[in-house]
Amino acid sequence: VSVNIDALSGTSNSPIYTLVARTLTVPRAQVVLKVQRPIVFLTSEERSFGQTKSNDQISNRLRNLLANNGFEFTESKSSADLWFDVKADAEKGSISGSIFITYLTSVIKVAAVKEGKEIYATTLDRVKGYGLDYDKSSVDAYNKAIETLEKERMNELLNIVLQ
């Protein structure tokens, strides 16, 4: 890094200024930047009607979104910078004709591991899903929650986490 002496003169083209500027010793500094990607430990507990789901839809999508934004993942919490914890459960709602309604509530928390401090939390509360049976309506509710996460919450999450 060094000072640009020519920029200090502005629009002046004075030959005297040029002569003086050449005789000045400009301080210089070398700066070494270590660019490091945030390392994430991700845990999840996704359920439908109290039963553990075979696939973790929200956490898988969150992992994909974070990876696309430059985050790396680890299986060891102690080596992580951030801990993302996803908890979600779908509950049975009503039946209207042949349409089954399910409500999904999901909580996503982010903690700084080394400080042991929660830095972000959001809730996707009672996201409504529809289907021809409760299982299909649960999948629909999870899909709508993922859409909400992507479109409404992801930018906020990234802004807070990357500060």
What is the predicted role of each segment?
Residues 69-80:
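Short acidic low-complexity segments
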Residues 52, 76, 93-94, 129, ...:
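Generic marker of "main functional regions" within proteins
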Residues 5, 16, 39, 58, ...:
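Weak global preference for isoleucine
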Residues 64, 78-120, 125-127, 132:
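Surface-exposed short loop/turn segments
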Residues 113-160:
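Short secondary-structure boundary motifs at beta->alpha junctions and helix caps
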Residues 51-59, 101-103, 134-143, 147:
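Solvent-exposed, acidic/flexible segments
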Residues 1-63, 161-163:
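A structural "domain/chain start" motif
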